[in-house]
Amino acid sequence: MSSKDKKPSKPSSSRGGIRTLSDLNRRSGPDSDSDSDGPQEYYTGGEKSGMLVQDPSKKDDVDEIFNQARQLGAVEGPLEPPPSSRSFTGTGRLLSGENVPTGNQQPEPVVHNIVFWSNGFTIDDGPLRKLDDPENASFLESIRKSECPKELEPADRRAPVHVNLMRKEEKCPERQKRRVSFQGVGRTLGGSNEGSGSSSPVAPDSAPIPIQTEPAPSQSLVIDETVPTTSIQLRLADGTRLVAKFNHHHTVNDIRGFIDSSRPGASLNYQLQTMGFPPKPLTDLTQTIEEAGLANSVVLQKF
């Protein structure tokens, strides 16, 4: 058979690279490949921010958010941000012992995961938020416009922000509270608490393991649900991770008070700083969460 009789080969529909919007919006026909059965994922962003959008199947309010983000420039991309350069970055030292200053280093990207559930949405490990809540209108409008919401902007304006949007059909699961074993002293009905069976405290089930938990807020910390709230992840020096809820007008000192109330008797000689590179020390205790750009951020405890 001559080369003129050969039919042109059908282009492959590889999902590995970035596609144009015409490729993404093309409806699948009878001859479409089988890999188009799953939900499409789109990535939008630039030098300073990025967003991955997974196209859902149901038509509802969340559909509108995903579709508008796609229409404003979303393209298919990976869920995680591209890996940073593996080249050495650090401080040089001459043979004479003097340090050589290095150039400006690109801050690490800040990643936020927004999950849309059937009963609302969550940001990272924060509380469930309602789609019809007027307080969330500005946040959702930024998502529709493929923009980084203001409350997710990092303290370091040079740091790129990657916002991953995910869709789950089930309801957001309720958080399980940590069960604490009883460690008191038993007392018999006769009034005597002597004896090996009642005088010794009950041993815990196992050694304490730092887990993510949310202790009761301090007496001085009052959350006003009528004004904007935010969740801040606190990574303590012992490895424990706490997620605390604050109002935007709360201060850095209120964050310290929350940590101190969760660790009574612990040393108070520590410093708080934002996560990122370079880390930003939070030395002004009167600075509000909004002023410091700490909404939905991660704060580290350092001794």
Curated annotation (Swiss-Prot):
GO cellular component: cytosol
Disulfide-linked positions: none
Entry keyword set: Phosphoprotein, Ubl conjugation pathway
Presence of the UniProt keyword rRNA processing in the record: no
GO molecular function: ATPase binding
Listed Pfam families: SEP, UBX
Residues recorded with modification Phosphoserine: S181
Region (Disordered): 1-107, 170-220
KW Cell membrane (keyword) present: no
Domain SEP: 109-173
Domain spans labelled UBX: 225-302
InterPro entries tied to this protein: NSFL1C_SEP_dom_sf (IPR036241), SEP_domain (IPR012989), Ubiquitin-like_domsf (IPR029071), UBX_dom (IPR001012)
Subunit and interaction comment: Interacts with CDC48A via its UBX domain.
Name by which UniProt lists this protein: Plant UBX domain-containing protein 4
The organism of origin for this protein: Arabidopsis thaliana
Gene: PUX4
